[in-house]
Structures are given as C-alpha cells and as structure tokens.
Amino acid sequence: MSTHILLASGSEIRAKLLRQAGVDFRVEVARVDEDAIKTALEADGASPRDIADTLAEAKARKVSGKFPEEMVLGCDQVLDFEGTLLSKPKDKNQALQQLKAMRGKRHMLLSAAVIYCDAKPLWRHVGQVRLVMRMASDAYLESYVERNWESIRHAVGAYKLEEEGVRLFTTIDGSYFNVLGLPMLELMNYLGLQGIIEQ
C-alpha cells in the first residue's frame, strides 16, 4: 500500500488541513455530477448523512478508477437546515436569503470522508456538528455577503467559519474540523493505524 494519498477534492481548506498535519498527498480532483447524485438521493428519501457519505464515496471511487493502487480520499459536506439541504449559493441574493433564513436557528453540517484503494472502500466516517446562528441584522448580513462573496460562494450555507463567518454564530457543538469539511481526528487515527503517517 502507498505511503501517500490522493485527495479527490479541489478544496483549498482540506488540502491546507492535510498539509499542516504533515500528510504526504497530492490533489487529483474528481469530476462527478454532484447535483445529479444529490437530486437522485433526495428523491429516494436518503438522509443527509447518507447523501454526504455517497457523494464522498463517488469522488473516491472515480479517482480510484484511474489510480487503483493508490489510497484515495474522497470528501463531501452537506448542510441540513430544518430537513432541507442547502447548497453553495448560486449568487449573492441566494447567499443572503440562506443566511437570513438560518439566523437565530440551528443547522447541522455533515462532513464525510471515504478512502478507496484497489477499487473498494477501506474506511469511511461522517462527522457532524450542530451550529446556532446569531440574530444578525439585515444590514450586517448584506455587508457580510458583499465583503466576502468571492470566498463564501464556494461554501455550503454561504459562510466560512475560519474567516469572518465566525461572527455569525453563538454556539458550535462538535468538531471544528467537521465545520471545515474534513473529520481530521478520525482520519489521522486511521492513517496512523495503516502506517501512512507516523504515530
């Protein structure tokens, strides 16, 4: 088995987390139709947890098909707000509407990671975190979206907790890493047990 991994994600924050943890990896972005997969799963009544897990597996499987002997890490994150999955905002107005809907309320982020090797899944984990958004004013939310659009357009829920988005919240119950989109503690434990990283 290889001593490095392929990250089947173009996420800068996931790459940064792995790099800072000293993991030897390279990026090989998976080209999958996430919207089609998500729509089909929602139509079948799949849970948000299962949707996150299936999307992460689809990415790992896709890249593993090209590099079967490599260890491939696929990841995905979904946001469950009152039974509805929120996606990355399509424009500033949608970002603002998402934030206004969530203020003063609780939502859940589910971060899935799946490792594939030899065309089969070896490990998987779905971490979850519950967040409560503060009652921010319309004026603040409008200026927040305007200031941060280039960054938050790539984030489910239209915020990044590692940036100014931290000001939007009153409570976070769960791992900060799951908010960032990668269950790092569980992943590091698995990679250590497999001899991929030193323990």
Curated annotation (Swiss-Prot):
Cofactor(s) needed by this chain: a divalent metal cation
UniProt EC number: 3.6.1.9
Localization per Swiss-Prot or TrEMBL: Cytoplasm
Catalytic activity, reaction form: a ribonucleoside 5'-triphosphate + H2O = a ribonucleoside 5'-phosphate + diphosphate + H(+); a 2'-deoxyribonucleoside 5'-triphosphate + H2O = a 2'-deoxyribonucleoside 5'-phosphate + diphosphate + H(+)
UniProt GO MF annotations: nucleoside triphosphate diphosphatase activity
InterPro entries on file: ITPase-like_fam, Maf-like
GO biological process: nucleotide metabolic process
Enzyme class: hydrolase
Keywords linked to the UniProt accession: Cytoplasm, Hydrolase, Nucleotide metabolism
Task of the protein: Nucleoside triphosphate pyrophosphatase. May have a dual role in cell division arrest and in preventing the incorporation of modified nucleotides into cellular nucleic acids.
Recorded family membership: Belongs to the Maf family.
Classification via HAMAP family: Maf
Name of the protein described by the UniProt record: Nucleoside triphosphate pyrophosphatase
Lineage, broadest ranks: Bacteria, Pseudomonadati, Pseudomonadota, Alphaproteobacteria, Rhodobacterales
